[in-house]
Amino acid sequence: MPQPESQPQMLIERLGLLPHPEGGHYRETYRSTTKVATPRGERCASTAIVFLLTAGQCSHWHRICADELWLHQGGGGLLIHELSPAGAYRRTRLGLDLAAGETPQHLVPAGHWFGSEPAAGVGWSLVGCTVAPGFEFVDFSLARPEDLAPIAAAFPNWRRLCLATEPQVLPRLSPPATQA
């Protein structure tokens, strides 16, 4: 049995995870062959990834043009921060400790800004994310500070999750090479 501190590295290696442009590590595990029409063009009906965040990492504020269902798969709780198009802030704790208020799955609706991070004291969190219609990098936007102004008072640390304030990281924002 691996030591807790080696668990994330073992997951990265065994699951074949790659760095994700929004933070953390991921691997696409499913891409539907069924196509659907959307206002942005044809998309796969659904896609899925496994996604790992470790202590000190975060999924930077971003939004996509489709619903995204988050499912807790391992490790500790994960905080999902969300800003609706109307400016309402919501925080959800994803995990399996129902007595502590965690939920095993959470839907982030299309068009919401959101970011995530392991809860305080959590070493790592592994989740599955399913997007419908399917994810395409062309439908992915990283937040700028002005996009998140409505939550500045309610969530004073929002800038910590905002990649757009860290231009040295932006060159990573390109879709991963498709593996055959």
Residue ranges and their predicted role:
Residues 1-106, 115-116, 122-123, 133-136, ...:
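Non-catalytic, conserved peripheral segments adjacent to functional cores
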Residues 130:
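Histidine-centered acyl-transfer/condensation active-site motif
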Residues 111-112:
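Extracellular beta-helix/beta-solenoid repeat scaffolds
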